[in-house]
Amino acid sequence: MGNSESALISEKQLEIYQLETFFTRKEILHIYQSFENLNPDKVREAFMAGNYQVKMDYQEVIQLAELKYSPFKDRICRVFSEDQSGDMTFSDYLDMLSVMSMQAPKDLKAAYAFKIYDFNDDDEIDRTDLDELVNRVTGFRMKTEDVDGIVDEILKECDMDENGTLTAAEFEDILHKSPEFSANFNIEV
């Protein structure tokens, strides 16, 4: 990274970002560059004025390579957007990438994965959420009966209290038994 990028983020702000994330100074500057590339004039103008809370709207954010092809991009943006609008500040974007980094603990990843897959935001993953999850993963190409069968199996295997929903604790327990989860819930920086 050249001096032009680091000059836009104060040393104090870089230190704060390093304390609040799992990233090095160099990684933060690299992440800043990808954020800036969404709308260079808007970001540079705000950062030069010391405004690190400039927001990219959802349509700009989903152009990021890390999100562009994800079937969950709308949920990811909403969950990591401080106001749940899907619009993101650089801090929101940095938080998202930090949680999805290989350095983030599995518990933190699990908590955010739960929020992303809780499509109706009712603090549990129910049949409707699981239908949506399976449909998104498969590109909405499965028959309803097949999706229902998969959802039935998920609930049979994972719903410990047999109430038809997965709590955050049940969901986290499932993910702890899944060694590939951390690697799959990952965005390389």
Regions from the PLM with identified roles:
Residues 12, 154-189:
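C-terminal interaction modules of eukaryotic adaptor/scaffold proteins
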Residues 47-68, 88-101, 115-116, 125-142, ...:
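Amphipathic regulatory helices of Ca2+-sensor modules
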Residues 70, 110-113:
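Bromodomain acetyl-lysine reader domains
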Residues 1-72, 77, 82:
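Eukaryote-specific detector of the first structured module of a protein
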Residues 85, 122, 161-163:
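Acidic carboxylate motifs that coordinate Ca2+ or other divalent cations, activating on Asp/Glu
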Residues 104-108:
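Short pre-active-site segment immediately N-terminal to the catalytic Zn-binding motif
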Residues 38, 79-80, 115-119, 156-158:
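Calcium-binding motifs, dominated by EF-hand helix-loop-helix domains
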